[in-house]
Amino acid sequence: MGLPWYRVHTVVLNDPGRLLSVHIMHTALVAGWAGSMALYELAVFDPSDPVLDPMWRQGMFVIPFMTRLGITNSWGGWNITGGTITNPGLWSYEGVAGAHIVFSGLCFLAAIWHWVYWDLEIFCDERTGKPSLDLPKIFGIHLFLSGVACFGFGAFHVTGLYGPGIWVSDPYGLTGKVQPVNPAWGVEGFDPFVPGGIASHHIAAGTLGILAGLFHLSVRPPQRLYKGLRMGNIETVLSSSIAAVFFAAFVVAGTMWYGSATTPIELFGPTRYQWDQGYFQQEIYRRVSAGLAENQSLSEAWSKIPEKLAFYDYIGNNPAKGGLFRAGSMDNGDGIAVGWLGHPVFRNKEGRELFVRRMPTFFETFPVVLVDGDGIVRADVPFRRAESKYSVEQVGVTVEFYGGELNGVSYSDPATVKKYARRAQLGEIFELDRATLKSDGVFRSSPRGWFTFGHASFALLFFFGHIWHGSRTLFRDVFAGIDPDLDAQVEFGAFQKLGDPTTKRQAV
């Protein structure tokens, strides 16, 4: 046929059997990739430290999606929360991966069968004897089946009625676990951070899908609508399907980047806005203040801060700090976190407590500035020492650590104080192992960043694909250059004057 590469899909345009075949093969490729990728990630994943080296620090991409749906155990004898298990059951990480690969193989065989046996009776229009598809009826079938799946997921899997539930955590990502979720039918169900909304929305959307599917199965479209929307053209199906996919991609890019109950920070890492707003820092200070109110010492109050909470309050876990084209996991960037050194408290020689200004997200370098409780600059690390007024040496800044590995340790040596002031710009201070993975010290993004970038990019491409194919199907006659009156115009004797539709002959 000699088709150019960008037109090869025309071979299935009027061939329902092989159109079905290539879609089954596509499903085989997707399921095969998912299963294979899961096995690869399981081969390189280290489950030993879920607090300082969680899945998102290691660059895991498919493991978080399995986990949020209720998979927590491995045939390797470990649990995602750090415990050991003896009976992981069939639906472990490996079990799910294996199921995808088996399903992929079955789809592969089915695709070959449908490619060979393409000329089936079911695809033939009995009136014309030619291959054709009843697209409105197929739309109704798909809508009904997807509605059943959607309803079933919300009513059974998420609620734990027949299934494990989903991953649910607290607002600070500390106590996450898989548990059943009750549907939220009130206004709170519209809060994107309320897990109950996942159950109720799936139940509601599934019910709507079932009813809409039954409607489209029992009611034929009006002729004008059928012709106006080109419902008999397979390219209409392609166009509207692309629209559904790009819309979904835009939505999930938003829920991933801005955060929601469907994208827990324990599985995908924190969002950039949690750093920008000092979200974890405020919670840490609230807990310390509560401890001091209970007559705890500063050291005791800081020692009770969970290491997990302190680790979230570190700029290296901000997905917007890694460049989009820096390959590798977060661990390949700043290293594997080993331990929290503690919270540094800086004071000048007058005993006034100073706070290091934190680095904003989109800065690579930032001046080291220490301010007091009123926001007045009291110390800095100057660019030009000759003009300095607030240098660490001049102001006499010291640092003391509370909580963590350096609890109770203080330093007055200016070089050491400046070192910790620079590190305090980046949030809580952690000891990082760069040797194991030969980490280069350049921040990387988390799976949250990759997912958002990928889905936003493809959504944009698919948006243009929708416009393209929608235009092609709506204006097919214009693009093809076929005028509906063309037959009459060139028919001998149709007009008194050849090609002039105003002189049409009247039949006697």
Curated annotation (Swiss-Prot):
Location in the cell: Plastid, Chloroplast thylakoid membrane
GO cellular-component term (any): photosystem II
One record GO biological process: photosynthetic electron transport in photosystem II
InterPro entries in UniProt: PS_antenna-like, PS_II_antenna-like_sf, PSII_PsbB
Keyword Hydrolase among UniProt keywords: no
Keyword terms: Chlorophyll, Chloroplast, Chromophore, Membrane, Photosynthesis, Photosystem II, Plastid, Thylakoid, Transmembrane, Transmembrane helix
Membrane-spanning intervals of the chain: 21-36, 101-115, 140-156, 203-218, 237-252, 457-472
Aminoacyl-tRNA synthetase is among the record's keywords: no
Chief subcellular location: plastid
NCBIfam families given in the database record: PS_II_CP47
Record PANTHER family: PHOTOSYSTEM II CP43 REACTION CENTER PROTEIN (PTHR33180), PHOTOSYSTEM II CP47 REACTION CENTER PROTEIN (PTHR33180:SF38)
Database matches in HAMAP family: PSII_PsbB_CP47
Record's function text: One of the components of the core complex of photosystem II (PSII). It binds chlorophyll and helps catalyze the primary light-induced photochemical processes of PSII. PSII is a light-driven water:plastoquinone oxidoreductase, using light energy to abstract electrons from H(2)O, generating O(2) and a proton gradient subsequently used for ATP formation.
Name the record gives this protein: Photosystem II CP47 reaction center protein
Gene: psbB
